[in-house]
């Protein structure tokens, strides 16, 4: 009997492959860094071949290290950085342009024009999204316009579009399957989340030929099998979800009202709203949390573009630390009398502001400000932004009021300083799970659910285990003062935009 699920986690800065046991623990892991390219201000790209080669290499390495073969693998589950856009040749699988990464802002002017022309209401009603360069539609349009002959080839059916999951699936299956799942489709700004189908009006608006698009399937579904030459025998691919939705599944947030927040390069908080999509009045987005057996579960989502990236800035930009973990120690040494605020709008502000043109700033600097105060400001910025998201969720969903237990995951959740400060500023408990690889676990669970490797969601949820609960320790008046200082800083920046 197969003993593992092979989970592929293709992220913004690295690709990983992990073997997951039936009890949800990790048996083996392989990881490779993924280069990014910044051809101009606000532009972020990756080579499609780097994405593919790192994923394939990690899969082969993890199988070799564990001494297992295809017969030991029940299924493959894929999770991926969302919105990142690729267009490739169907005949060869070769991309016609570098992947345009979700952080890329080059289409901000196009988005502003569409908003000014009054298209925002239609897009919001059909997709649950706000018009923003973050999503895939304007990235696709840019590639079709920039690459000579691309539009004509797309209309002839010679090209294929996909987010990273779809591209990997195409390559893994030897070009036999061009498909995606409902969560990734819901991030394109082309997908009607109510009907569960590509929307002809939006395809016309963005100039995207239908022939370019992948088939949309459930998150737990039959996605084909790997080409036998890759691993020596075919391995079925049975699960797929965007990284944040996969983390929600891995956190067992299956009940309406449950909230998780993932801290990686960015920060993404999702609130399960059940089988009814909730239209946000506070500039959150409505998205598909997961789709199983044809039934869609929806979520309200707030997206923050800079979380762990702020720590990377301390390390790589300011050269203040050598390793990300040092930021905790440094922040703990900060002078509490200095109220330094960092608004890390390096690539604009995400939810609930959605201001792509705003840039970052520091407030409250004095002659005494040093590395410790800057480190604390970087970590607190993540907490402040999370508070903005949770407040918006409270206001949007009638079932969400009062203190919320927040389940956290992602690399930055390992920071005790940040998680404690998050609980302090939220005025609510923050729960860190024993298994922090929740994104991988979610992808593995979806694949395992499809083939009976894992139990139904209600039983799976009983296995969720707490590692530590952070409880608020900040006085109410101090919390209110700190949040007011943050919001004043944000308003100052927005007023200059």
From Swiss-Prot:
Alphabetized UniProt keyword annotations: ATP-binding, Glycerol metabolism, Kinase, Nucleotide-binding, Transferase
Record: residues binding glycerol: 82-83, 134, 243-244
Gene3D superfamilies, per the entry: 3.30.420.40
Enzymatic class: transferase
Any one GO CC term of the record: cytosol
Binding site for ATP: 12-14, 265, 308, 312, 411
Binding site residues for sn-glycerol 3-phosphate: 12, 82-83, 134, 243
EC assignment: 2.7.1.30
Protein's name in the database: Glycerol kinase
């Amino acid at each position: 009997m197969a003993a593992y699920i092979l989970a592929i986690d293709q992220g913004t800065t690295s690709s990983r492959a992990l073997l997951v046991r039936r009890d949800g623990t990790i048996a083996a892991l392989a990881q490779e860094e993924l280069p990014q390219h910044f051809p101009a201000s606000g532009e972020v790209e990756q080579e499609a071949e780097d994405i593919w080669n790192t994923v394939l290499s990690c899969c082969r390495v993890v199988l070799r290290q564990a001494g297992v073969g295809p017969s030991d693998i029940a299924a493959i589950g894929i999770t991926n950085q969302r919105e990142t856009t690729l267009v490739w040749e169907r005949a060869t699988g070769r991309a016609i342009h570098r992947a345009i990464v979700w952080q890329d802002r080059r289409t901000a002017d196009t988005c502003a024009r569409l908003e000014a022309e009054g298209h925002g209401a239609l897009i919001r009603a059909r997709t649950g999204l706000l018009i923003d360069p973050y999503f895939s539609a304007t990235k696709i349009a840019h590639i079709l316009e920039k690459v000579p002959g691309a539009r004509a080839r797309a209309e002839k059916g010679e090209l294929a579009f996909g987010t990273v999951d779809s591209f990997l699936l195409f390559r893994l299956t030897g070009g036999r399957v061009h498909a995606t799942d409902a969560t990734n489709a819901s991030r394109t700004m082309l997908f009607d989340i109510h009907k569960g189908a590509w929307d002809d009006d939006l395809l016309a608006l963005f100039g995207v030929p239908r022939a370019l698009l992948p088939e949309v399937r459930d998150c737990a579904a039959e996605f084909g099998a790997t080409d036998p030459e890759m691993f020596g025998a075919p391995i079925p691919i049975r699960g797929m979800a965007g990284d944040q939705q996969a983390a929600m599944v891995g956190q067992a947030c299956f009940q309406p009202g449950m909230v998780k927040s993932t801290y990686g390069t960015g920060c993404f908080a999702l609130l399960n709203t059940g089988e009814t999509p909730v239209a946000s009045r506070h500039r959150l987005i409505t998205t598909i949390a997961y789709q199983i057996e044809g039934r869609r579960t929806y979520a309200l989502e707030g997206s923050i573009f800079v979380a762990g990236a702020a720590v990377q800035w301390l390390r790589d930009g300011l050269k203040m630390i050598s390793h990300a973990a040092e930021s905790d120690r440094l922040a703990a040494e900060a002078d509490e009398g200095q109220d330094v605020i960092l608004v890390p709008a390096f690539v604009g502000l995400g939810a609930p502001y959605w201001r792509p043109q705003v840039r970052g700033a520091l407030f409250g600097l004095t002659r005494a400000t040093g590395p410790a105060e800057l480190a604390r400001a970087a970590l607190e910025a993540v907490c402040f932004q999370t508070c903005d998201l949770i407040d918006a969720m409270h206001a949007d969903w009638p079932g969400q009021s009062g203190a919320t237990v927040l389940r956290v995951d992602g690399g930055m959740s390992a920071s005790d300083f940040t998680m404690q400060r998050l609980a302090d500023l939220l005025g609510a408990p923050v729960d860190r799970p024993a298994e922090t690889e929740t994104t991988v676990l979610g992808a593995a669970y979806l694949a395992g659910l499809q083939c009976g490797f894992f139990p139904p969601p209600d039983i799976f949820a009983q296995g969720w285990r707490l590692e530590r609960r952070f409880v608020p320790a900040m006085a109410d008046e101090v919390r209110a003062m700190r949040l007011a200082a943050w919001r004043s800083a944000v308003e100052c920046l927005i007023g200059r935009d």
